[in-house]
Amino acid sequence: MLRTQGLRYNYGGDGPNMAFPDLELKRGEELLLLGASGTGKTTLLHLIAGMRTPTEGTVELVGKPFSGLPVAERDLTRGQHMGIVFQTAHFVRSLTVSENLALCQSLAGQEADPHRIQALLEGLGLGHKLNARVDALSVGEQQRVSIARAVVHKPGVILADEPTSALDDQNTEVVLQLLRNQAADAGAALLIVTHDQRLKDHLTERIELSPIPTSA
């Protein structure tokens, strides 16, 4: 489903030249990418998601080249096959919760499915927030809506960027279980990128991310 090979990224100037390990993730699999600050976690996430273009190497999605696609085609492919939970939630603030989820389905080339949206929100304890404005939600509620938005179009890959870094132990377990359950329901691969060492107790498949700057 998701495969990377020989990824490197050069920030140019005095910025680091970063090399990353190869990854392969199939539907239904989970992988934890651990790394301290400065190891390039966010850079790697952006490369995988097609938000940056690698200096070298490739990203394949659903068995096809992804990283080398034109930007517009890359955006469309991402919308169809990926769901992303960002560290800070991003929504269209003028829309309701259900409208934000329907927009995600539309960007994936799907018709809005009110029944799926309602069922998904109810499963996350947010059925009563269906028509609420996202800026009226608490931080925790926004995070759950972010998870709903990441899976509403049934993507093949879910990427989560530091989903638990600001949470206490109890809420860390709650959010992690929500992610895993929703990924399983969608039949999606789950990739969590974080510095949160607590997640090692929950996910056995993991890679310690420590890319070595290269001069090449």
Predicted regions and their residues:
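ABC-type ATPase nucleotide-binding domains, specifically the catalytic core motifs of the NBD
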Residues: 12, 102-115, 123
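Helix-to-loop junction immediately C-terminal to a conserved catalytic motif
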Residues: 49
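ABC ATPase NBD coupling module
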Residues: 66-83
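Short coil-to-helix segment of the ABC ATPase nucleotide-binding domain corresponding to the Q-loop/switch region
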Residues: 95-102
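Conserved ABC ATPase signature
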Residues: 133-137, 141
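A short, proline-enriched helix->beta-strand linker immediately N-terminal to the Walker B motif
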Residues: 152-156
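Catalytic Walker B motif of ABC-type/P-loop ATPase nucleotide-binding domains
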Residues: 158-161
